[in-house]
Amino acid sequence: VFVQMVLCRNGEIWDNSYLYFLINFENKKVLVRVDFNVPLDKKTYEVTDDTRIRAALPTIKKILKDGGSMVLMSHLGRPLKKLKDDGSIDVEKFTLHHILSKLSELLGQEVMFANNCIGEEVVDQAKSLQAGQVLLVENTRFHKGEEKGDPEFAEELAKLGEIYINDAFGTAHRAHASTTIVAQSFDQDHKAFGYL
């Protein structure tokens, strides 16, 4: 169970953000769970409210400033509950690629995109990241293992980073693979909450 506001160490209560001073992000690949579940225009799929994206910027910029690279993961909507007539996922409607241009604009730099969130191809993309680069992976809810809290799916996600940061406070109460379960793959010195 995560505690968002405070953490205790050696009998002292610290503000959660203090953990940032204990983690060295330099030349590290950081897996960050963000909450980019934002509203989109029903016709153009453009972001109509970027509040949640803006809320993640302090954490993202902190890691980049400290010399890290990062893989961002999020869900968008409920794709497995709103399947197409043929039973397939409506990728066009629920892809996180819709977030890419707005995120790049707000961050002031190019953000790369991976067409999946697990698998050899995305692992290779993550490994090739240089300091200061950002990779956004595809919607975690395209996989059943996400909402089921599947440990095997979480282990696949964990391959994308050396450090795990949960910056998705709005979803932290759910025992999903990309929030609670994936954190179990990282020791205490390699995981923390973001500024949210």
Describe each region flagged by the PLM.
Residues 2-196:
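Active-site loop-to-helix "anion-binding N-cap" substructures in soluble metabolic enzymes
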